[in-house]
Amino acid sequence: MMPFSREERQFVYTWLSNMLGHELSASQLAQYQQGLFDDFFAFLTEQGFQAQVEGIQQQLQQLKTVELAHLELAADYTQLFLLDGSSSALPYASVYLPEAQLTCHFTFLEALLVRFQLQLNRDKPEPSDHLCVYLELLRQLAEVDDMKTYRQLIQDALLPWLLPFNDKVQRVKTRTTFYQQVVVLLILLLQADCQN
């Protein structure tokens, strides 16, 4: 993998946040199926993520044969991320990190939120340890080109809980594996980007 530019990092993390922050609408799904993201998928393939891109594209292709496919994907999203902790893979660090690590973890996270003057959307009460908060912090760190903190966030604050989160994601039974493929891509991108 070639090192990402600042703009590429920002785009990738915005895309991942959009993919994992809420279910795709019918119009968003149609955009993927019509090929509007083919250039982005080609970029990811060139970066060495061919298997993951093919998996995502295969799921999108299969959904073309499903009536009301966006509702099927919404059901998968709900099953994966929104039910209780025994049924779903909740996208929160506090679910996967040991209790002893939480204070230090949240102190680091809160310092970054303050640094970038990020406030959580009070209309939708989300805890600060939601996966999309981390993705936004990565985007912000890429924007200011603070690669030391960027790598620290990935290695010390994100991957330690993202790996067990992915284990749970892969065990949840859904009709498609679309979101499972996206989570694997996220982890591989983080691991590869941290090594460059």
Swiss-Prot record:
<dbReference type="InterPro" id="IPR023069">
    <property type="entry name" value="Chaperone_TorD"/>
</dbReference>
<dbReference type="InterPro" id="IPR036411">
    <property type="entry name" value="TorD-like_sf"/>
</dbReference>
<keyword id="KW-0143">Chaperone</keyword>
<dbReference type="GO" id="GO:0051259">
    <property type="term" value="P:protein complex oligomerization"/>
</dbReference>
<dbReference type="GO" id="GO:0005737">
    <property type="term" value="C:cytoplasm"/>
</dbReference>
<comment type="function">
    <text>Involved in the biogenesis of TorA. Acts on TorA before the insertion of the molybdenum cofactor and, as a result, probably favors a conformation of the apoenzyme that is competent for acquiring the cofactor.</text>
</comment>
<dbReference type="GO" id="GO:0006457">
    <property type="term" value="P:protein folding"/>
</dbReference>
<protein>
    <recommendedName>
        <fullName>Chaperone protein TorD</fullName>
    </recommendedName>
</protein>
<dbReference type="InterPro" id="IPR050289">
    <property type="entry name" value="TorD/DmsD_chaperones"/>
</dbReference>
<comment type="similarity">
    <text>Belongs to the TorD/DmsD family. TorD subfamily.</text>
</comment>
<dbReference type="InterPro" id="IPR036386">
    <property type="entry name" value="HscB_C_sf"/>
</dbReference>
<dbReference type="Pfam" id="PF02613">
    <property type="entry name" value="Nitrate_red_del"/>
</dbReference>
<dbReference type="InterPro" id="IPR020945">
    <property type="entry name" value="DMSO/NO3_reduct_chaperone"/>
</dbReference>
<keyword id="KW-0963">Cytoplasm</keyword>
